[in-house]
């Protein structure tokens, strides 16, 4: 995947695909029949049982995520299409929730908090709009905050917050995302 030419939804789906558990099974024994000429350690897909990446000791962490995303896109195109559609809905839901940030329930509104360690930064806490109990935390610089009272931020900060929220929403079911749209 050439990440330079991906849509925001494709980028979000790729990041999420890197963490999908069923595509990241580790084969550590060379006698495993799935290897078929490849050597362990290797990654195999729990859905199709294909061994799709040999791992070297120095690249295990970086290869696992990238290879899993590539495998899902190549070997499971129907799932990939659904993942892109889900990412698109999550981005849309995140934008809608961000636009409604001043009119939603008070406990689901983003809040600003003083950063105790770095005085030149302010922490923003963004609760999950699905109300799952997760609160996303990020730090903003003073120049990214345009108005604290109405939660107005620079375009860069807004895009970052929306992307972070969409990344979290990817973990929720489609029906939960549909309720936000």
Identify the function of each model-found stretch.
Residues 1-9, 175-181:
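Short intrinsically disordered terminal tails
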Residues 7-32, 85-112:
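Intrinsically disordered, low-complexity linkers and flanking regions associated
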Residues 28-30, 51-59, 133-156:
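Short recognition patches in nucleic-acid-associated and regulatory proteins
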Residues 29-40, 113-123:
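Short, flexible, mixed-charge glycine/proline-rich loop motifs
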Residues 40-43, 123, 127, 156:
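Disulfide-bonded cysteine motifs in exported proteins
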Residues 45-48, 128-130:
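Short cysteine-rich clusters marking metal-coordination/redox-active sites
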Residues 59-84, 145-178:
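C-terminal recognition-helix end and immediately following basic linker
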Residues 112-113, 126, 145:
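Extended non-catalytic scaffold regions that mediate assembly and binding
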